[in-house]
Each structure stands twice: as structure tokens, then as C-alpha cells.
């Protein structure tokens, strides 16, 4: 959306940049200005300067600069509109949308106003109406203090007649209430329920979650607002408005199942806690965590079978998205709320610290699903776990997980790696059978080049030795890439994956005089037989120069012999021309020069 220049100027003149940046950076006064260590790069001596009179910041170390809007976009990942809305709310500035976009924006603004008025009315009913006393007593019994109730703006929805009357007094019609999701076929969805506002990351109320606190009444235990133009359940992370700053700073999150659990966790100081809204955690929710910069997720789900099942599912989603999942198991029958009430925050911190990595939890769960863990069951567990692990990030990461798996199930690492190779080969065979009847023109064109033999050939081992040198070469040592570049070309690599790594490495080296990262190169072989061969053997980096010379020598020797054998086969009588002999002899001489 686009705002008028006048309203944006009003906002910019209203912003106190020190109060905004001070929430994220430890500022120290330096004369008329402020300084700090830059949040955008590592440094020990402050070079990040904030100029209050100009409403501007500048880092003289990395060059980052801008105003409060730029800072929020960079530091918090806000879009321009989100940053503007956040600041407008903080400094009480009314923004005006440009005329051509006013219609759609008016709808959102109208819905925000209805939600705001409803939220205020529900709070009033909880604290000041006789009907709210029972709900208030229930909240106190559950451990919600007056400060907690006020902080999270918890309220109580009375019966339908009072609600409609109160809204009409605020110029909100029944038709508008139906549009906003409060009424459905003349039924007030939230009548006589405790109301928990659902807010977006900027603090605007976009919907409600209601809880039945006594027997009777229509609907289930929880009723949530239906989806609207503001409220999309699959994208909402409950508690984000209270946890976003801490999550951005620490890049970790605690995930719980319910809103009450989330609020109690935050109230006890665990200000990086989130819950899903109206549904279980989905891939979309995990994608939102990735956008927030989360690198580690603590799964604190209920201590029952459903909670264990949720940990298995959400943990796999996190791992596949590159987020390290830590499973924290609560005692049987407890949830985070009850655990806090009974044992306190210190014991919960200890429980979080004792959390186990997701792979260990996954293996434990699968092992304990069998009455007897025989060798046959062990093989089945390894295969099932590998099917999940092979989707968890970069090839190097996958290899480390497979090493851990081997340790957990007490089998040699090569055995686990061979399982990965066999699973990958089986998947490839299945895909070939499906498409065998109607091969595409593209497959016909490429069918004769770059195939990896299902039985690893001696030549493939030699090619892998050279590629392994590129993978493990020290960044400061140019001998390895320079030597490989001097003596080898794509022609020497028959394995398509190794040839692709060679081309990537040489192009990168030609452009920047450095090699690509190991992850970049390994991404070309993930899940293939070629990867299995690369990670199956260790590399002595202290002898790297000798190894690369020997590896190139052996590969070129093999290449020369293969070409000679092929020529003999084609002519049926060996070398039949002096020209061919001289050419091959020249290549053989080139090989000798490496020694």
C-alpha cells in the first residue's frame, strides 16, 4: 500500500530514533549523539553512530545507514509497510492512504477498528460487569495475575444482546459484525467465553481465541475467529508481538501447543515462546520461523501421546527447513502451564537445557515402538530414519547426521552410508521404470553421457579422489585449485556429478581466485552414489599437496590408458597411424609432467 507524502513526513518528524533503536541496541551518549557496537556486523569498538537531530544512523565500520524505517526493515525483517505501521502506532500518527488504494485499505482499517472496539469492550466486561466475575475467578485460579490479564488484554464476552447493543453504540452494525466474523447466522460465536486477543507482529488485534470456562454453552472448548482479510490461521504465530525482539536477537524459539501455555511462558520470562493458532504447526508456520531468522526451536509440547506425536512431526518440519529441533519432554500428563505452576520457572529452564536433539529423540521413539529390537528391526529403523535425514539440508549436514545415527544404533558408519546409497539407487530405479515406456527427447539426448555405474568403478574412485581434494582444500592454499586447473579438464571426468563440481570450482576459481564453499559443491551430489563415495573416506589435509599430485597423476594415467584401449578397439588392430600414436604419447608425456 502507498501512503501520502504528507502523512509519511508527519510520521518521520514524530519519530524519536533513539527510543526506537534503543530497544534493539545498547546506546551510549557521546556528546549530542549516541554510539553502540553495530548490530549488523561483529565489532568490539563502537562505530555505529545515531544522530538524533537528523533522525539518522550510520555505521563507519560496515557502511550501514538510514532512518528508523530502514533500521526496522534491516534488523527485524519488516517490509516497508510493516515498519511504517509499527512506527505510526508507537508514535500515535494517523496515516493516510493514497486515494486510488483507499478502498481496500478502508476495509482493513474498518476491521481493525471493529476488533479494537470489541477488545476494549471485552476487557471492560471482565473487570467491571457482574457477569465477568466468574471468568475472572477462573483466570486467577489458573495463575493469571491482574498484571498478566492487563498485559495480554484478556477479556470476557457477555451474552449476545449486550454485545450487539454495545457495538451499535459505537456505530458498528450487525452486518459489519457478521462481516468481521463475530456473528454467524444470528449466533454470537463468543458468548460467555474468556477472550484472548490474537495480534499480528505489529500489535494490531486481528482476531480472537475464546475459551469456554464452565459447563454448557454452544461450541467446543475453544472457538477461534474465522479467517478474514486480516486473520489467516495458517500464517499466525500466537505470541509473536511479545516475542519478536527476543527471537530476532537470540535466533531461537520455544514452541508450545496452546495460547494459555504461550501466555504463561511469556509471563514467566520466556519471551521467545510461540504457539500455532487454531491448528497444529504446519510447514507454513515453519516457513514464517525461517523468515524470522530462527536457527533453533525447542519443542515443548504436552506430556502425552499427542504431544509426542506433535514433536515427531514438527521436529521433522524444522529440520527440513534448516532449523535445529530440540525436544523437551514434559512429565506425563503435564503441559507447560501446569509445569510452571507446580515447579516454577527454574525447573523449566533446566528441562529446556536437558532437551535432546531431534535425531536422538526420533531414533529413541522408533526403537521403543518395537517389543523386541532385533537386527531386522534395527535395519528397518536405519532405513526409515535415513529417508527423513536425506531431506535435512546440505550434504555435509546430512553426512554428520548419518554419523550420529550410526553411533546411536551402534553400527559402523560405512554401513549407514551404504544404506543411503541403496535407498537413492532404488528411488532412481523406480523413477526409470515409470518413465521407461515413453523416454523424453531430453533423456534420449543425455542417456549416453555422465551415467554413474551402480557398481563403483576404479575410474570413479580416482575422480572422487581429485574432487575430495577440491572439497577439503584450505582457502589460503592456491596450490590445489591451480594444479587441478593446469592439468585437468571436464573431459577427464566421466561421472556427471563430479564433472559438474569440477566446472563449478574452476569457474569460481577463475573469477575470484578462490574455490566455492564445500556446501555449494556438495549440493551437486546430494543423495547420489557420488556423494556416498566422497564422504566414505577421510582426507589427511596435512598431506594435501602430495595427495592432489598423486590423484591427478593416477586419473590422467587412467584416462590415457582408456583412450588407448578405445582406439585399439575401434581399429581392431591397435594404433594404425603415427599421428594417433604421437597424440596419445603427447598426452602421456603431459601426465608425466605432474610427477
Swiss-Prot record:
Gene3D superfamilies: 3.40.1360.10, DNA primase, catalytic core, N-terminal domain, Zinc finger, CHC2-type domain. It catalyses: ssDNA + n NTP = ssDNA/pppN(pN)n-1 hybrid + (n-1) diphosphate. Keywords: DNA replication, DNA-binding, DNA-directed RNA polymerase, Magnesium, Metal-binding, Nucleotidyltransferase, Primosome, Transcription, Transferase, Zinc, Zinc-finger. GO terms for cellular component: cytoplasm; DNA-directed RNA polymerase complex; primosome complex. Binds 1 zinc ion per monomer. Residues 430-451 are annotated as: Disordered. Mg(2+) 2 binds at residues 302, 304. Its EC number is 2.7.7.101. Its cofactor is Zn(2+); Mg(2+). Contains an N-terminal zinc-binding domain, a central core domain that contains the primase activity, and a C-terminal DnaB-binding domain. Monomer. Interacts with DnaB. This is DNA primase. It comes from Chlamydia trachomatis serovar D (strain ATCC VR-885 / DSM 19411 / UW-3/Cx). The gene is dnaG.
Amino acid at each position: 500500500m502507498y501512503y501520502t507524502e504528507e502523512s509519511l513526513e508527519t510520521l518521520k518528524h514524530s519519530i524519536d530514533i533513539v527510543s526506537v533503536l534503543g530497544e534493539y541496541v545498547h546506546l551510549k551518549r557521546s556528546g549530542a549523539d549516541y554510539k553502540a557496537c553495530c548490530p549488523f556486523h561483529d565489532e568490539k569498538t563502537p562505530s555505529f553512530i545515531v544522530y538524533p537531530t537528523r533522525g539518522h544512523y550510520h555505521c563507519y565500520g560496515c557502511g550501514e545507514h538510514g532512518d528508523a524505517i530502514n533500521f526496522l526493515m534491516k534488523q527485524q525483517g519488516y517490509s516497508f509497510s510493516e515498519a511504517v505501521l509499527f512506527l505510526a502506532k508507537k508514535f500515535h500518527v494517523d496515516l493516510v492512504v493514497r486515494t486510488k488504494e483507499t478502498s481496500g485499505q478502508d476495509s482493513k482499517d474498518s476491521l481493525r477498528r471493529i476488533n479494537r472496539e470489541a477488545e476494549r469492550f471485552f476487557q471492560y466486561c471482565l473487570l467491571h460487569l457482574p457477569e465477568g466475575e466468574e471468568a475472572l475467578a477462573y483466570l486467577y485460579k489458573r495463575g493469571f495475575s491482574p498484571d498478566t490479564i492487563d498485559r495480554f488484554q484478556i477479556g470476557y464476552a457477555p451474552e449476545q444482546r449486550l454485545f450487539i447493543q454495545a457495538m451499535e453504540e459505537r456505530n458498528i452494525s450487525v452486518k459489519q459484525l457478521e462481516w468481521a466474523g463475530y456473528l454467524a447466522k444470528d449466533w454470537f460465536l463468543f458468548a460467555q467465553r474468556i477472550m484472548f486477543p490474537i495480534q499480528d507482529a505489529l500489535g494490531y488485534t486481528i482476531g480472537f481465541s475464546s475459551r469456554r470456562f464452565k459447563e454448557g454453552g454452544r461450541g467446543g472448548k475453544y472457538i477461534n475467529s474465522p479467517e478474514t482479510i486480516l486473520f489467516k490461521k495458517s500464517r499466525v504465530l500466537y505470541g509473536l508481538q511479545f516475542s519478536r525482539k527476543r527471537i530476532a536477537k537470540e535466533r531461537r524459539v520455544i514452541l508450545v501447543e496452546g495460547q494459555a501455555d504461550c501466555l504463561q511462558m511469556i509471563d514467566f520470562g520466556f519471551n521467545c515462546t510461540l504457539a500455532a493458532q487454531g491448528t497444529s504447526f504446519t510447514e507454513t508456520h515453519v516457513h514464517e520461523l525461517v523468515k524470522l531468522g530462527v536457527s533453533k526451536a525447542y519443542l515443548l509440547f504436552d506430556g502425552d501421546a499427542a504431544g509426542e506425536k506433535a514433536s515427531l512431526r514438527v521436529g521433522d518440519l524444522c529440520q527440513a527447513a534448516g532449523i535445529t529441533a530440540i525436544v523437551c519432554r514434559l512429565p506425563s500428563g503435564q503441559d507447560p502451564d501446569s509445569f510452571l505452576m507446580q515447579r516454577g520457572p527454574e525447573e523449566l529452564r533446566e528441562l529446556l537445557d536437558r532437551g535432546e536433539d531431534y535425531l536422538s529423540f526420533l531414533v529413541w521413539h522408533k526403537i521403543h515402538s518395537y517389543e523386541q529390537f532385533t537386527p531386522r528391526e534395527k535395519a528397518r529403523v536405519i532405513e526409515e530414519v535415513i529417508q527423513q535425514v536425506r531431506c535435512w539440508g546440505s550434504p555435509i549436514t546430512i553426512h554428520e547426521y548419518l554419523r550420529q545415527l550410526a553411533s546411536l544404533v551402534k553400527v559402523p558408519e560405512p554401513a549407514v552410508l551404504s544404506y543411503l546409497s541403496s535407498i537413492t539407487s532404488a528411488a532412481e530405479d523406480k523413477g526409470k521404470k515409470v518413465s521407461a515406456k515413453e523416454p523424453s527427447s531430453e533423456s534420449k539426448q543425455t542417456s549416453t553421457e555422465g551415467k554413474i555405474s551402480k557398481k563403483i568403478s576404479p575410474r570413479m574412485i580416482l575422480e572422487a579422489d581429485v574432487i575430495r581434494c577440491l572439497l577439503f582444500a584450505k582457502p589460503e592454499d592456491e596450490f590445489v585449485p591451480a594444479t587441478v586447473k593446469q592439468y585437468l579438464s571436464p573431459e577427464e571426468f566421466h561421472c556427471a556429478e563430479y564433472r559438474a563440481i569440477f566446472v563449478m570450482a574452476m569457474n569460481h576459481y577463475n573469477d575470484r581466485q578462490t574455490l566455492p564453499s564445500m556446501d555449494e559443491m556438495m549440493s551437486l551430489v546430494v543423495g547420489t552414489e557420488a556423494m556416498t563415495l566422497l564422504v566414505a573416506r577421510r582426507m589427511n589435509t596435512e598431506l594435501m599437496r602430495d595427495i592432489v599430485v598423486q590423484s591427478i597423476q593416477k586419473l590422467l594415467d587412467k584416462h590415457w590408458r582408456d583412450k588407448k584401449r578405445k582406439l585399439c578397439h575401434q581399429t581392431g588392430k591397435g594404433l594404425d597411424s603415427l599421428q594417433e600414436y604421437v597424440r596419445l604419447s603427447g598426452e602421456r608425456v603431459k601426465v608425466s609432467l605432474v610427477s
